[in-house]
Amino acid sequence: MTLRHCVAVDLGASSGRVMLACYAPEQRTLTLREIHRFVNCLQKQGGVDTWDIDSLEAEIRTGLNKVCEEGILIDSIGIDTWGVDYVLLDRNGARIGLPVSYRDSRTDGVMARAIEQLGKADIYGRSGIQFLPFNTLYQLRALAEQQPELIKNVAHALLIPDYFSYRLTGNMNWEYTNATTTQLVNINSDNWDENLLNWTGVSAAWFGTPTHPGNVIGHWICPLGNQIPVVAVASHDTASAVIASPLASQDAAYLSSGTWSLMGFESKTPYTSDAALAANITNEGGAEGRYRVLKNIMGLWLLQRVLKEQNVSDLSALIADTETLAACRFVINPNDDRFINPANMSTEIQAACRETNQPVPNTPAELARCIFDSLALLYADVLQELATLRGKPFSQLHIVGGGCQNRLLNQLCADACGITVVAGPVEASTLGNIGIQLMTLDELTNVDDFRTVVTGNYALTTFTPHSCHEIARYRAQFQQKRLTKELCA
């Protein structure tokens, strides 16, 4: 029996994994095994939030070497990460400085100037991408204005997954799904938009033509001397997660739940109407020419920060405590831009409740309950915005990613949205990464074919809405909470 062994490098903003997939084509069985896990976190360098890119590369190589040490012949490798951040290279291909995190404050005020100078409708008409203050469009302008002495030495800019592929193969690539997150790709041409790039103040020569998922970038030479193909997968982690979302029909929506929550639906055409602009809907690139019509929600970033600040290590116990608390005593707008990177998340949440004359959550369970209720209510609002945009309601919501393990949040989401929620798979980004590799190896025909493999190998859990739940009755009041300055508005 012939087996295919593919390795997925899946990097998130808080952790990274090297995962080994084993696929049996005849039985269509697909298994995953974690080979190596490591921490990823922001580090301050000269007062700037940066990524320790060299440490991450070392961890990736450690994971790949571990697979080889087991005597496994790897058929291919794929890398997916978060979007918008980039690495600068000189003409010799050497790294210049450390990549700055999208959570750094250097872009403060830049988006507002772009809108004033270029026009919001023009930017959106060109890119189809939502307005987020950390988009690469604004990061590059901040770079050009704040570090002009640096850019004269730059020859190339690679997005994070493309940089790691370059380090493994020596070949540069600009993968399309991740490139679209920059707000610099023209939605009609699938190439870099000349006007938007000109506004950044950096050279268009830094960027090569974007390539769609499924091409071989080059080869990594393993310690045994074998040349292993490195595939350009859908390198934006959400794009990979959507590929692995077992969407039952065209009327199914998805929610990729992790540090960020990305809620949306698939479409063969983009949505760039005035209504889409008003709702700040994004049209990010997907596999096979599909668009990921979605909206960013701050997600479990709030919980991750609270857990760290409150020294909570047992999440299951915390959720059990949280479940005993009354719903909607404390409600915030998770997308308020005050929560993007506060000095202390717990204190910021408490301040937001205090300022709106609510009870103040003090215990870890109360803070978690505030986050879960608030996210569920925001999910319901965004799902309604998306349904209005497409002109018809959704039949199901598929929650994938690490956040889908939170049964309480899944049920609250079903109750608030009034829709059936199907949770799983957990390892959606990794699976979507593997799916593109298997298509590149000619083991699968397309995304829909791969989704049948996912449903045949991974258990899904269904959550039915309870229409009488208090959270469903609170939605009208929540609308008032959203009258704040939203990050993603």
Curated annotation (Swiss-Prot):
One of its GO terms (cellular component) is cytosol. Transmembrane segments: none annotated. The active site is at residue 237. It is an enzyme of class 2 (transferase). ATP binds at residues 13-17, 259, 304, 402. GO terms for molecular function: ATP binding; glycerol kinase activity; rhamnulokinase activity. Substrate binds at residues 83, 236-238, 296. It catalyses: L-rhamnulose + ATP = L-rhamnulose 1-phosphate + ADP + H(+). SUPFAM superfamilies: Actin-like ATPase domain (SSF53067). The lineage of its organism: Bacteria, Pseudomonadati, Pseudomonadota, Gammaproteobacteria, Enterobacterales. Signal peptide: none annotated. It holds the Pfam family FGGY_N. This is Rhamnulokinase. It comes from Enterobacter sp. (strain 638). Disulfide bonds join 68-222, 353-370, 413-417. One of its GO terms (biological process) is rhamnose catabolic process. CDD domains: ASKHA_NBD_FGGY_RhaB-like. Its cofactor is Mg(2+). Pathway: Carbohydrate degradation; L-rhamnose degradation; glycerone phosphate from L-rhamnose: step 2/3. Belongs to the rhamnulokinase family. InterPro entries: ATPase_NBD, FGGY_C, FGGY_N, Rhamnulokinase. NCBIfam families: PRK10640.1 (NF007925), rhamnulo_kin (TIGR02627). It comes from the Bacteria.
